[in-house]
Amino acid sequence: MRSLLPLLALAACGGDDHSLPPEDFGGCDGIVEAVPNEAGVHMPVGTHIDWSSNPPAIGAHYATWAGWDRHYQSLDRAYYVHNLEHGGIVLLYNCPGGCPDVVESLLDVVRTAKVDTTCEGVVKNRMLVVQDPLMPAEVQVAAVAWGQVYTASCFDPYVAKFARTRYRRGPEDLCNDGVPMSGALISFPE
């Protein structure tokens, strides 16, 4: 019986559970999900990729990544998944009728983020704001890091905490700027 106690305690505590620790995800029905590990395989541009989460947070992607510190009105997901692999954060919005207040709030998260001193002289930080109409209809805002997705029905300041606590967590901690893709609305000032 004595040898069973640690196992029972482990089971009671969710010992083999890979869920995230309890955290206040703000309002807006926010939820954070850990996405099962998938290989970050490089695929030819234009290849159809099926990801295990929506929006995608890990897995196959194009060999090129998008230029950092930009707001993209449109960007193929396979580019921004590569940005995640490099330790970046992608802030997404889905507003078919437009949502300038939400977009401005996401841009403020990027503008007020600390300068990445490891990337000094290359980029301010490794963040993007991207419109993503492929997200589920009930998701207006998402924040994505390699292997982690926060989704919500509206903007909540929790987005900034998600970005701050998961920044530079990708398997390739690289500062190199990506390619300035078409669809970029603005570049963030240094």
What are these model-derived regions, one by one?
Residues 6, 20-22, 167-169:
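Residue-level signal for mature regions of secreted extracellular proteins and peptides
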Residues 112-190:
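Helix-rich interaction surfaces within compact, conserved domain-sized segments
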Residues 1-7:
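Sec-dependent signal peptide recognition
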Residues 14-16:
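Bacterial signal peptide processing site
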